Every structure is written in structure tokens, then in C-alpha cells.
């Protein structure tokens, strides 16, 4: 199994199709603890909730995720509060999932 966290996210200009369910399940096996859900338009996204001891730990984690997102030019939706951080990842340009989404998830898991 390749280590997705060592790959680089590739910018998407919308010229590729989103992953189908078989591709999603293949890549989902390469990341730990992430779930696949549907947006209102039925497109897929990755989601994971991280737990922390307090607000400060959550905020520090968000800052680290933000740094990775900037390095990779791939930006997740983030919500956080006392003791938690929820990360939602998908490729906006294709309204679905692509390899870069799984790469970003793997990099976040390395924090």
C-alpha cells in the first residue's frame, strides 16, 4: 500500500471526473477513520471528527491543518469548538472526490 501522505496534492481545474464508488472504496482503505458522506447534491465528501482535551488543543490542530492546506493548495471545510474538530474534504471544482482529497486526509492524519 502506498503512503498517500508522501504524495503532493494536484490542483484540479475541473477537467477530471470525480471518483466513482469503487475508486472511493479503494482509496478509503488507505486512510484511517475517515467516512464518506453525500452533500445535498449527492456528491461525495470525506469527513472525520477529531477529539481533543480542550479548546486550545482543537485550535492548535486547526492551525496545523491550515498550514498543510496552504502548502498543498487544497483547502478543507473546518469547524471546531471545545474538544473537537470536524474536517470535511472534497474537490470543489468537480463536486466530488479525487486522489488529492485522500492525500490531504492522509497528511492531516500525520499531525
Feature-to-residue mapping (PLM):
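Long, contiguous binding/interaction regions
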Residues: 1-56, 63-111
Amino acid at each position: 500500500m502506498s503512503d498517500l501522505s508522501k504524495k503532493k496534492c494536484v490542483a484540479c481545474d475541473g477537467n477530471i471526473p470525480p471518483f466513482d464508488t469503487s475508486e472511493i472504496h479503494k482509496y478509503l482503505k488507505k486512510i484511517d477513520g475517515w467516512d464518506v458522506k453525500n452533500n445535498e447534491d449527492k456528491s461525495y465528501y470525506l469527513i472525520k471528527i477529531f477529539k481533543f482535551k480542550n479548546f486550545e488543543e482543537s485550535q492548535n490542530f486547526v492551525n496545523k491543518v491550515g498550514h498543510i492546506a496552504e502548502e498543498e493548495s487544497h483547502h478543507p471545510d473546518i469547524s471546531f469548538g471545545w474538544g473537537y474538530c470536524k474536517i470535511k474534504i472534497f474537490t470543489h471544482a468537480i463536486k466530488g472526490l479525487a486522489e488529492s482529497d485522500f492525500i490531504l486526509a492522509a497528511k492531516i492524519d500525520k499531525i
